[in-house]
Amino acid sequence: MKFAVIGHPIKHSLSPVMHQANFEALGRDDSYEALNIPPKHFHLIKEIMAEKEIDGFNITIPHKERIIPYLDAMDAHAKTIGAINTVKIEDGKWIGYNTDGIGYVQGLKNVYPNLKEARILLIGAGGASKGLAAALNEAADHTLSVANRTMSRFDNWDLKVHTLTLEEAEKQLGDFDIVINTTPAGMSENQDVVIALDHLAPDTLVSDIVYIPYKTPILKLAEAKGNPIYNGLDMFVNQGAESFKIWTGETADTKAMKNTVLQQLQRRD
């Protein structure tokens, strides 16, 4: 079977080597490639996938919402979220799923067992944030707070969340047990920190869904303050494993996947 990940930019993605490690561990003769598709060329997505005979693919920034009009169906979870990170192509039909939130929460519970009672702030209101918000709403009792620079970004949100501006969030940081950055700030060469951490409580866990670099600027800042930190590696591995199960019905070798990603990250350092 042939799989892929689409995004822009995509050169930093470790999805191909991670999935290849899983294929080899399971003795499968599958392939997985990264496809850089700029927004201006996205209308060609059907032709591109047909030409490459792709059976399923992942979607990353900035296409998680852009893909929706091209789908024939979405599962109930993805419909609630309104963002897609996984597409299965079956008998010519494109079916959309979202495994981001599931993957993130699986890992978060390992580092924050008392997740049910946590007060959580998400930073960013893009497609990735929607996926996490849906899963965190199910996992935690408190109403989730989501902060974004542009409030109009919430106009197409159907999820029950408390919305606030970045400025409001900065002042209220001390009220949260977990703060999660879902924006691209800090990814690869981007050294931005989207929110000041001056009012952060001492024990608040600061997380970032980015895994390249291993410690983003916001995580370094939090660590310097003595706060616990958690990056996006487990989410990356777990969402990939969930996608693989959707495509094939098989359980992925997450140990092989994670070890391969860690090796690649060490080489980049």
From Swiss-Prot:
A cellular component term from Gene Ontology for this protein is:
cytosol
| Coiled-coil regions listed in the entry | none
| Claim: Protein transport is one of the keywords in the record | no
Q: Does this UniProt record's set of keywords contain rRNA-binding?
A: no
Instruction: Please list the residues that bind shikimate.
Output: S13, L14, S15, T60, N85, D100, Y211
State the reactions this protein catalyses. shikimate + NADP(+) = 3-dehydroshikimate + NADPH + H(+)
Q: List the active-site residues.
A: K64 (proton acceptor)
Q: Which residues bind NADP(+)?
A: G124, A125, G126, G127, A128, N148, R149, T150, M151, S152, R153, I209, G232
Q: Which UniProt keywords apply?
A: Amino-acid biosynthesis, Aromatic amino acid biosynthesis, NADP, Oxidoreductase
Query: What biological process terms from GO does the record include?
Result: amino acid biosynthetic process; aromatic amino acid family biosynthetic process; chorismate biosynthetic process; shikimate metabolic process
Query: What is this enzyme's EC?
Result: 1.1.1.25
The terms under GO molecular function for this entry are:
NADP binding; shikimate 3-dehydrogenase (NADP+) activity
Q: Could you tell me which pathway this protein works in?
A: Metabolic intermediate biosynthesis; chorismate biosynthesis; chorismate from D-erythrose 4-phosphate and phosphoenolpyruvate: step 4/7
The record's section on InterPro entries has: Aminoacid_DH-like_N_sf, NAD(P)-bd_dom_sf, SDH_C, Shikimate_DH, Shikimate_DH-bd_N, Shikimate_DH_fam, Shikm_DH/Glu-tRNA_Rdtase
Q: Which family, according to UniProt?
A: Belongs to the shikimate dehydrogenase family.
What does the protein in this record do?
A: Involved in the biosynthesis of the chorismate, which leads to the biosynthesis of aromatic amino acids. Catalyzes the reversible NADPH linked reduction of 3-dehydroshikimate (DHSA) to yield shikimate (SA).
Subunit relationships: Homodimer.
Please state what the protein is called. Shikimate dehydrogenase (NADP(+))
Q: Organism source for this protein?
A: Staphylococcus carnosus (strain TM300)
Biological classification of the source: Bacteria, Bacillati, Bacillota, Bacilli, Bacillales
- Which gene does this sequence derive from? aroE
